[in-house]
């Protein structure tokens, strides 16, 4: 059965991935620029306010989430394989310049993240137990009055986060643990299925509780190690940064498609992996943003905007510089997580390989939990029946195991294809609803 799924996914990837991404790049950057301009550079003007809101936001009432818990749930999905394995893949396939395009995607995308999470708060609904839920499927239905488009988005999110992204997370766990401890993928996959089942049958509130306590600790440990490594090579950092900028505008190797030489591999891989990592404008974080109880809708827009900054500008940059400071960058045999692990071996010895395997295991597992939370919200939007939710949970467990035993190329390409569909639908929706976000932002600044 797994082989049939793999063959079907391969056919879809071969026929739809390239044309979808040609469209996605234009819309992603265009919408980000639109909101950057119309909000008056919100990612710079209100950046200090986003930090205050995240730390001092209103406490939860009933079963709703605090702003910090919603931030951590969003970060649980953002901070993960994309920051470690995704960055390595981008550099291996697109060169140093891919890092620059990850930065651009994040900076422009911060305004899109602000807009989509503000909308999630405006159009959220309250359940009988007092908790809130919402996201693109809800603001498309209520704001654009289009149930069909909302269901299409919900399905794209379910396939992207519930299935594809969780396959990627599981695949990266297997690769990292195999490199470090020679663990077999089949057994790792079974353990992941059991651990995931134990959490996803416990409720979204438990997911938020785990995320808010574990994710910041993981990110802190990883950043401490990164700062130590950067300090050891501080004299080389200016050269690394200069090479990133220089390579970003080298168009010798085109990505292909209708843009031809206008889109380099650096740009294509930087944008793909940047979007995978920070999810800005994709329509995922609004599902966590809607669950928060805040005084003003814009407050959660600011919090989720901050998540994009932390994810890409800090965590992804640390990974990139660690790789580019090593002596194995450019090796044709090292890609994905193995490139990052070998870079750490160069800097701190075998400890780095084992440390990264452990950190990535926690990162990726927390991402699986966060991804599930997003997808479950959309499953309930389509059909809020116990048997439907349980069927979805079993499907999630299948794809966790699927990613554990299949090749990295298949699961990464699957993720690229479905997240392009999801991003296109959401970006079009938030532009059509832009008067609401812009109006709320203006109102928030007057109070």
Regions found by a protein language model. Give the residues of each.
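Extracellular/periplasmic helix-exit of transmembrane alpha-helices
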Residues: 114-124, 225-243, 251, 255-258, ...
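Membrane-interface loop-to-helix entry segments
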Residues: 27-31, 35-51, 171-177, 184, ...
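N-terminal alpha-helical transmembrane segments of multi-pass membrane transport
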Residues: 1-81, 91-98, 109, 401, ...
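Flexible loop linkers connecting adjacent transmembrane helices
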Residues: 42-67, 89-91, 95-99, 103, ...
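Select transmembrane alpha-helical segments in multipass membrane proteins
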Residues: 25-31, 66-74, 146-160, 188-191, ...
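Transmembrane helix-loop junctions in multi-pass membrane proteins
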Residues: 38-43, 82-87, 96, 163-174, ...
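Alpha-helical membrane segments and immediately flanking helix-loop junctions
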Residues: 61-93, 119-137, 141, 155-158, ...
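Helix-loop-helix module between adjacent transmembrane segments
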Residues: 34-36, 105-130, 136-199, 358-368, ...
